[in-house]
Amino acid sequence: MSHRAFWFAARLTAVVAVVFLPTPSSGQTPVPAGAIAAPTEDDILRFKMPTVTVTAQKEPEDRQKVPVSVTAVTRETIDAAGIRLVSEAAILSPNTIFTESTARKLSSARVRGIGSSPNNPAVTTYLDGVPQLNANSSSVELLDVDRIEFVRGPQSALFGRNALGGLINVVSSRPSMAGWTGSLALPFANYGAWTVRGGVSGPVLKDRLAIGFSAAQVSRDGFTINDVTGHDLDSRSAFSVKGQALWVPAANWEARVIVTGEHARDGDYGLHDVAALRANPFHAARDFEGSTDRGIVGTTIQVRRSGGPLVFSSTTGIVKWTTRDRTDLDYTLQPLLQRDNAEEDLQFTQELRVASAEQAPIALSDSAHLRWQAGVFLFSQGYQQDAVNSFSPFVVAPFPVSQHSPRSALDDDGVGLFGQATVTLATRFDVSAGARFDHESKDATLETFYEPQIAPPSRVDAEKGFSSVSPQVSAAWRVGSAHTLYGTVGRGFKAGGFNAASPAGREAYDEEQTWNIEGGVKTEWAGGRVTANAAVFHIDWDDLQLNVPDPAVPAQFFIANVGGATSNGVELEIAARAAPGLDLFTAIGYTKARFGAGSVSGPIGIEGNLVPFTPDYTVSVGAQYSRLVGTATVHGRVDVARSGAFQYDEANSLGQDAYTLVHLRGGYTARRWLAEVFVRNAFDTAYIPFALPYPNLAPSGFLGEMGAPRTFGASVGVRF
């Protein structure tokens, strides 16, 4: 069977399974994630805001009680807003943005100004407890997701490496033990967009074994037109799948296996000169039209034993991804330079953890109790890249020349030991202290050479180790049952490493460290109908790692330590159940992040400059309304997101002005059937959220991609 025939058969099998798999009924059963459940009259008339449980500190806790800034996007919000990617949910979290292009592999989260290279993220995405050590595998289609947690501020004391800016925790819905359920949805939109999404879930052995399966095929035409050929450049097409099994072999024991996969075959990057894009949006001109492909397979195994005074848990993760992108590297009409870049990565992670049970804290006295957790984390990662730059005749020689820049192999192994203890005094005052020790060993083989050999090849073999201790202390005071005041001080850590490609002598970079001071308040008002949370923070960076361009090689970037920086800001989140069926919400963030004294990037002094891709403010406001009409439900939602101005590079030579996006969605649900209409970027705002320095070849000095234009469509679906 050919490669293409295999994937066609896989897609057909997935859709047939979703539609025709037997689904025996067992009374009233929950609707699986991905379907929009018709709310009952009790749901709509309920005034109190729901309690949301998060695992921002590994153990389940009420979002309003945990002394951490966290925004939880629940399954209900994911469905109501039509969220299909983590980056789409980020507008609901203050001071959180994604630096990403339409290519799936380029997507990096930034929180409070902290963010860096996809190869060494400062804000790590956890998919069902498994950290994505390279951001390449983190931007995936959301299937059967129960919630997304945006945790802001350093979490290194518990999560270790690459969490000094925060973390994003994506949690899948559990397979249903109660009865079989399923859903199928068919959205379609302009730009030739169409999607088939579906899922089933239910028990195989009563109270012992349940399974779940979901899949999606998502495709659209490109937004950007190549004026040379008239073709659209940046088309997208991907098939995603998730399978789960939940096994309860005995009381207090459970095991869960989650397998995910993605097969993406996309068009080219929509990159073009920024000045030209602003004059003529969604148009480019190049002689070669390329492609960007990605494949991901991930397996997660979770085992948990509860009951008694201790809780034991194990999370094992294996993630394998490959990418290949072919593009016109000069991004001009001239046949000068093309790039064929292949990357692959295999990671293994294992965490073992023990914690005191919530119902069995250790009594220190009549008014003092202790809760604790401790664990060990192991990982191994192997990354390989072979990027071939093909020069046309008379560019570097009178004949065609290929340059492998780089051909590299990076291996990384590490261990982390962590613990946290929380003492509760008189049921109202918590004092917590935690710390984590991390050690990593890194090896690199870095090669650059030409075919034919017009210059001597270079090869670097290097190894280096990094160790760090990351402490954190916090205090929380519960004022009555509805309000919590808290303060935290913590250190963040991101290991150093090796660049797959860089100028000679810049192959290695050092670790980055931060100290974070934060104070906040979490409150409930009007009998639980209103929640209002606020935080202020101050961050000090040392040896900040920044992704900077290689002046000698187009589109090649490397990580460099550029000096220090500070970030100061405030955040406010308010949600209110204003009337039966009516929810109002807002999230506001302000950040001032600047480079410190003595900071330099190459030959350029950047002291006092703004940290790139850090808007000075983010604002999100919205409303959601549901109403019963007979036995059916009508619903509508509006989201308005505004981003402040930000810079594209550390030299602050070009940036994006403030812009506003408006998203609308509404629908009608009757018994098993659902119909919706939607508009994203309703006012067709033109903006360039992603741009990179490109001296010599781009007239403005920058290549950029337009943000998505106005898209609109409809969706029909069925639940069974």
Each model region followed by its residue ranges:
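N-terminal Sec signal peptide and the immediately downstream disordered periplasmic leader
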Residues: M1-I83, S87-N95, A251-N252, T299, ...
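Short acidic/polar hinge/loop motifs at secondary-structure boundaries
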Residues: D128-P154, V171
